[in-house]
Amino acid sequence: MNRVNIMRLSAFTVMLAVLSSVCSGQRLTGPHPTGDVPAPVALDTHGLFQEKFARVGDDVFISGQPTEQGLRDLHAQGVTTVVNLRTPEEMSTRVPFNEPALIKELGMDYVYLPMRGTPEFPYSADALKSFAAAMSGAKGKVLLHCTIAWRASHLWAAYLIKYRDVPVATALEQARMINLMDDMRMDGDRQPVEAFLGRTIPEVGHPKR
C-alpha cells in the first residue's frame, strides 16, 4: 500500500472515530430505536465507497458499493450488519472481491436483498419488510448499500415513511440528501419508493420516458 492510500485510510478512520465520539443518543437500530430520525450527513468517501457515503444518526450508514477496506474500517467502528441490494450479476461481474466471504470473516451479519426493478428482482413490500427486520434485529450499527446509493435511498425513504412515521415530504427530502434522484425511474409506472410502499406518491418525481 502506497503512502497516499495509507494517508487516505488514516483520515477516514479518524473521521469515523470523531463521529463516533459525538453521539446524539439516537439509536435507529435494534428493537427499541430512540428519538426522531435525524437528517443524513454526507461524508467524504475517501475512495472507499462508490460515489456516496452518508451517516444517519449514530448507527446507520448508507453508501454506494464499499471496497474491502471500507468494510473493514466500518467493522472496526462497530458496524455489525451489512444490507446489500445489488443483484448476483452485479456482485459477480463488478465487485473485485467476495463481499459475503469478507463479511463472514469479519463476523458481521450479511442481509442480502437483491433488487433492480425486474420481475426476478422487484422493488417490493416484502423487501421493505425484510429491511425493517434487519434494522430491528441489528446488534450494532448497520450499513445499507447498493451501487451508488440510489436504490438504498429509495428503500430508506420507504422505511422512514412506513416504519418510523416520518412525513412523506420529509422522508423524500432526507433521501434526496443521500442519492434519491427524481429524474431516474424504474421500468414501469412507479418509482422504487412507491413500489416498496405499494401506493402512488405524488411528491416524488415521475419523468417521462
Task: Show where each model-derived region lies.
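Coiled-coil-like amphipathic alpha-helices with heptad-repeat character
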Residues: R3, S21-V22
